[in-house]
Amino acid sequence: MSSLSQQLKSINEKTASVALDRKSRSKIHSKSLIFDPKIASTQDYDYLYQIGLEGLEDLIEIDSRFSKFKQTLFSETTINLDRNVQTQDTLDQLNKNVEVFLSLVSPYYLLTPSTKAVEWLIRRFYINIHNGEMLLLTSLPFYNSPVFVKILNVIPKNQFPKIFEWVVGYKDLLKSPTSSSILKSFHNDAKFFELYSKYLMDQLNNHAVFKEQLVFYLANTVQLVASFTHNLGQFGETYLPVILEVVGKLLLAGSKFSSTLRNDIMLTAYSIISVLSSLVPLSADLVKSFTESILQDPTACDSNTRKQTVIVLGQLWNFYNEDNFEVDCFKNLPASKLVQDDLLKNLIEEGYKINKLLVVYFASNLPQIDAFKIFDFINVDKSETFFKIVTSKLLYYAYNNQDEAIRAKLIEAFESLLRTNKELFVKVLQNYKDGLDISQLEMQLMTTLGDSNIENIHDADIELEDEEEEEEEDQAVLDVDFSDVCNSLENYKTSTTSFLNKSSDEEFTKLFQAFAEKSRSFNIKSQKLILAKFSKAIFVSPEASISFMLRVSFTPSVPLSIRLLVLRFIKLRLKELSLSEDKIDTYLLAPILLLGLYDTNKSVRAGFAELLRVVKDTTSKFHGNKKKVKTSLFMEDQIYGNTEPSKRAIVPPQDGLEMLNVLIEDSKSILDDTVIDKSRLNYVLFQVLFKSQKSGQKKFGQLLLKTFILNQWTLPFWPIVFKYKVWNIISIENNSNGGNDDRFFFIDTDLTDYFSNRDDLIEQAKASKIDFENDVEKAIVGLVGGTSSNDKNVNKEADWLLKALEAPNKLQVAAGKRLSSVFTSFTSIDMRAKLVNKLIELLINDGDDSDNLVVDPVEVLQLLDMDHETIISVLRNVQIVSQIPEQGIVKRRRRSSNSTKQAMARDDISSIAATHLKKLTIVLDLLEFNLRKKTSDIAKPDLLQNLFRILTDLDYLGNDGNLPILYAQETLASCMLLSIVQMKDNSKSNSFKFDSNVVRADLIVNSIRLSQSPQVQNRLLLVIAELAALAPEIILHSVMPIFTFMGAHTVRQDDEFSSSALQQTIAKVIPALAANGSSSLSYEIEFLLTSFVAAFQHIPRHRRVKLFTSLTKTLSYKHSLHIILFLMGQQYSNNITRNKAHESISILEFTSAFLKNFSAQEQLEGVEKFYQLWNQIPNAQLEPNSDEFNALSSRSIFGVSILSLSKSGLLTFKSQLLNFIDKVLDSDTQNDFSNLPSLKLKIALILLDPKKPAEDKSDLLNYFRKVTSFILSSLDTFTNVSRNDVLLDNLYALLGNFLDLLPLNYFIDSIIDSLDCDQISNTLEIKIAKNFAILASRKIENELNANNIDDVIEESILQKLLPVLNKGIKKNLDIELQQAYLNAFSSIVNKFGGSTHLLVTQGNTEALINSLNIITSNSGLLSEQPEIVISSINAITSIVNVLGVKAIGLFPKIVPPSLNIWKTTTASEDESSKLLQASIILLLACLIKKIPVFMTTSLDSIFITILTSDSVDNTVRSSVLQLIVEHMELSQVLKSLCNIWNNKKFYQNDNAGNLGLYLNVLQSTIERMDKKSASSQSTLFMKWLIQAFEFRHYAFDENNKFDNNTIHRLESSFHSCGASYVMKLNDKSFRPLFANLVRWAVSGEGSNATGNTELSRLLAFFKFFSKLQDKLKSIITSYFSYLIDPVSSILNRFANGDIVDINLRRILLNSLTSSFKYDQDDYWSQQSRFDSICSPLLNQLSNIEPNIGKYLVKCVSSFISNVSSEEYNEKLVHGLIEFISNENESTTSNTKIWTIRTLKTIFQKMGEQWLSYLPTLIPYIAELLEDDDEEVELEVRNGLVRVIENVLGEPLDRYLD
């Protein structure tokens, strides 16, 4: 930019708010965030300052930092400060203050105070002009809020910041920008993104950032990064540095923010980093830098942010692709934080990818001990790379770290890697440095890698070498220098004589570590020599040395190579002993060596087998012959320790040799099996060795050898490396046989001392790498329990298990599992109960000491195989009340409530009761579980009796002790229920007897009533139900209380369980009562149903139908369905009486849905029995104590409440019952949401199905006969005996609805006799017949259709019903009956005629003609009763509709009488007249459709009839009139329409609506007519048109009969009709007619009106002519020849004032304008026509009315435009000058003004064509400019002159001058 442009821009910015005029100042001042511009422009600064200050004060309350602006931007001195006159320094400071304020206020833009404060800055300092960019930056996060739109609005468009130009479009639209537009601007303009990013960093520096701003930046940055995924090069160059700078700033934001905002800032940075790392490849340095920055924040590892920190680090490092996994950026991330609160575990479970992060972290933090906390969470299984990295790092520190704690962690890690992938682990070892194998690693770590869960990890078993090999190897190592090793061994010399004692643990560990340390650096071959030297140098004797070596070989933690080396060493030493002169026997080692055969490693087992062979060889050498040799026993003291000699079960040498011979044969040793499979050792010992025999000693193996071996194995001081193998061997044997007495060898030693030694054993196991839980504790527990006859020892075992269950450790779990497996082996019931009670006590104490309880007692209890006796014993132990100390002697079994409450008031007793309640709950849970398993025969009467006692006790505790017994009650009820069900199932094989004093139904009923829990109540009801089936005699005496409770409570519950319990109870109690032969069964059922129905409103709505349906089916519909209907009817009656409409509807809906669940026969039988009950209700009040009264009052369904009603009350009640059942039957067929078929459909399916048995149909019809007979007899009673009209109406309705259920043919057959007039003899029969006829009509209407009309239906209706109806119509017995017959007749004919062609057959046609004769006689159409006439017309209509032209013979009997009848209705407005008119019109419509040709003669009368039937709706009449147009000859229709208007004076009708209908049908007729017909009737139509045009005058003469609006509407219709007709004519036919019309308009020729009608004629004509002009346009222009002279004359008369009619003048001018406009043939340019119209037209200017002057201007300008020529223009100019010249004295100001406006319009239209006449007009224009009338002057100056100047292109002043 040039320096000049820079200077100009600077000047422009400084002066942008400078305004030089008032308008500009007002515009600048009107920019406001709060006020409308008009209001804002008038406000002063004092007022604005007060608003701004008020806002600032409110902001100060929110943030005190705003207070500093009180002295600057909001100082009172700023009211008079004008920034446009300030120095540059002042402006710089002002801008700085504004920017700081805007930055600070930006979070509060949505608050009113901030708007007020910013309003002051905008209005006073014009920050919208000078600080617009900052204003937009601070408000941009609120882009979608109204305040941002306001800010856009106040920034002037010409001052809009260039970088924000993208938002100008939204400013113009006053709309918020979209999020996509903002993203687009960031994407397209890197400078804009950089600007906002720097602004955000400034906000962070100023501690003014806020949540919305962070969200805004994050959302856009994330989308921005995503948008550049295909153009990362550009992104990396332009945007990435900016984003990285912002992220760095966010991560180092500092701690001055609130904790919430600090978290928001941190999460914003994390989110951006996450997106960047996933979409943009980040360098390793950047990843490390991000990590350091993230962890540099001290809050990054806080509890509320730690998770997010690890997630983002995980995602960041997941894309790290460098080989170097050792980094130093995690120093601020301690491992303890990562594992705290299971963070890593939860993240891994949630699927977050953090594995690579953990690998890098672990590799970077080794060998720190904390790093191993992370190792367990690293998954190396799926990544070979990770596996190699981790393994290599661990190997490095295994060889380069001496810390013992690190070594232990390394061992755990290596074992984990081995479990994960053994093959890969071995491969990594082989590739590490010079190559390693697992044995070398074990030597380095001095431990065995792996456990029992890992298969043999060595590539091949290491076999013991022979002596020859040893000699070669010894020779090979002679050159190795062992001097240093030998010298150092002297320091470890020990005096310990035996290492087979656990007291030597410490010494053993110390010596082995010394050996391991010394031999670690040597190879295996060298280690052999070192071991020999070690043995000689350290131990005091060979025995001590061998004991040490044996222990080493048994210790799993010792590397395998060392163990094998030691076994080889032992083998050599034992061989040396065999060659010794001291004759030493080594067979005492056999039991120990046998244990070696149970090792997990095959090579070790093979080593021990070799040792046994050596021992066998030695023993055989000394004792192989029969000669006795005296020998010493090797290692006796080391093996037996301090054990008394008498307790050492040592076998003689010969027996020892025999034992070894059994184990090791010459050819094949059975020990070979154990070498292959260690589990074979049990077989070798217990099936071979211990069962071996020796001559003379049958129990040699069973007694002697077993005692010898087990005596050693039970030695308590042996180290765990020996004992755990012993325990496992004996445990397996004990469990495999269901119990073995060999286990008792250990009961007084190992088992008894186990609890005290357990902690030491754990430490020993850990040191030796023995799995304590599986290999020690499981084996120990396995020694306990099993079948045995030794009750003393069994009791000891039970006590041991009890003690184990109390142990505060995992021993509980093992003991619990063991107890569940050996529980049945305890034969003592008391012992079983003791064990169960112990588990219960543990469960009770769980809450008090839950930390020490590891086992789940509930699980153990459920695993126990309980029997009946044990359950009874446990139950007796928890009878609660018997445990409560009584204060006094109880004399009754049932304790008084008062005494119990007193006892329970004591705290100690209450505590005891609560504890025992817990016990009871557990026992009941246990009992329920076992009952549900059905694994044993637990359920017996004594169990039930105990449960009943507990039920009573619970009632006491719940009601008197206020203890929470609900759960216990519910469980108890379940137990009782299950036990009864099981006893019932077993009742076929067992007969049960119950103690009636204990097992009592009243106890259950009492508990039900006392309980507040619906669940308990329901379960106890089920108990009653099942008990009723098992022992009905128990519940017989408690039936009524049970039913009462169910009706009052259970039915109200809204759950499936309650519903099920209710149904099951009834289903089993009622049959039990019936089976018991109860005579009162029906009364009990009535009582039950009464209870249930009484609670109907409280039963959940959606359960009612299912409940009562189930109830009915359970009780049998024969016993219950009618009772439910009767009781529901009572409920309905009560609700109707109390005006409870909603409840009444609810009852009807329920009953209808309820009945649908039963078959047709069941429903009908229920209805019949309902009527029987209804009939039992007396018609009058009964005498109290009478037999009938007593009989009814004893029944719950009647009761005193009904019998106490008065006579009227009883009759009302009976009436309402009838109304109820009637509505139920009526609603049966209505649509509902049920999928079940209605009763009507069910009946039809039976009666109409030919496959149904005849018996079923007969039974069904029999029900109809019974009910019908009953209703008819009731009708007779309430008609002749005790008349009651309400009851009669209900009975009639009921009879109709009931019979309506029958299929149509059955229905007709059932009513045909009642309709026969020959059998009607009294009023009752007439009424019945009438109701049947109405019902028949309705049924035929609803049910008859083309699909269901068959021969049966046809015969029933046409052959049976129709003749009966004809006979009844002809006889005319009663008006209502006659009407019903006629209506039924109409329905039949309409249905059959519309659905089939059966009625047009010859026979049926004759029958209909005969019927028509009857109906048109005095019995029908000619009757004096309007009702009968209406019905007759309907019947005639139906017949005509069917027969059509075949009915023409009776035309004279139909149409003329009908029209005559219509005439009688015109003078009356009653309802019958309306109905008559409507029916007659419908009859005419039918005739017009069916026989239109024959209706032509009566067309005038038909039109008059239809058009003047005011009582009939217009839409009906309009549709009938449309039928006439559609079906009749249109020329006749038009002729008739014109005739009734012209000749019959229809226009005189007083109803404008009728005239409208007339014109509508005329319009339709014209539109449908063809041109030929229209031309033929044109003369007649023109006569009509002329007469129609005179309608206005007629209305005026009739004292303004219609208002102007009505007349205008009618005239508009006249014109539409006329115009439409003209469009049907050609020019030849229309011209003469038009000429006639003109003559009528001008001279009145052919007018029928009287008086002076000239103006009305002209007005009507020109309105019509204008409409024609709009339609025909130029076609009709030439027709003006007929009008030129009349128009000129009329115009002159207007100019002279002879005629004054504004409307006519306007229409005339518009007509001329249209003619000029549509003139395409220079019609008006013809000289004579121009001369004829020019002057008259211009003369209108002389006196034109102001309100129509514009029409004249338009007319004149159109005329001039049309006739434009020099000759005509000259004449027109001078003609116009005449009306503006002052020389014409008659010219008025009004004339001048309209002439000036005319000239202005002419110049606008003609343009330069009229400039040539300007010199002529200039003098007159100048004259007008000086006119005395100011209005004239202004019109010229502002109108004409400006137009001329626009055309001229220069000012007119010089011409005027």
Curated annotation (Swiss-Prot):
Q: Give one GO molecular function term.
A: U3 snoRNA binding
Q: Which GO terms describe its cellular component?
A: 90S preribosome; membrane; preribosome, small subunit precursor; rDNA heterochromatin; small-subunit processome; t-UTP complex
User: What topology does it adopt in the membrane?
Assistant: Single-pass membrane protein
Q: Which GO terms describe its biological process?
A: endonucleolytic cleavage in 5'-ETS of tricistronic rRNA transcript (SSU-rRNA, 5.8S rRNA, LSU-rRNA); endonucleolytic cleavage in ITS1 to separate SSU-rRNA from 5.8S rRNA and LSU-rRNA from tricistronic rRNA transcript (SSU-rRNA, 5.8S rRNA, LSU-rRNA); endonucleolytic cleavage to generate mature 5'-end of SSU-rRNA from (SSU-rRNA, 5.8S rRNA, LSU-rRNA); positive regulation of transcription by RNA polymerase I
Q: What are the subcellular locations of this protein?
A: Nucleus, Nucleolus; Membrane
Q: How does it assemble?
A: Component of the ribosomal small subunit (SSU) processome.
Its name, as the record gives it, is U3 small nucleolar RNA-associated protein 10
Give the species this sequence originates from: Debaryomyces hansenii (strain ATCC 36239 / CBS 767 / BCRC 21394 / JCM 1990 / NBRC 0083 / IGC 2968) (Yeast)
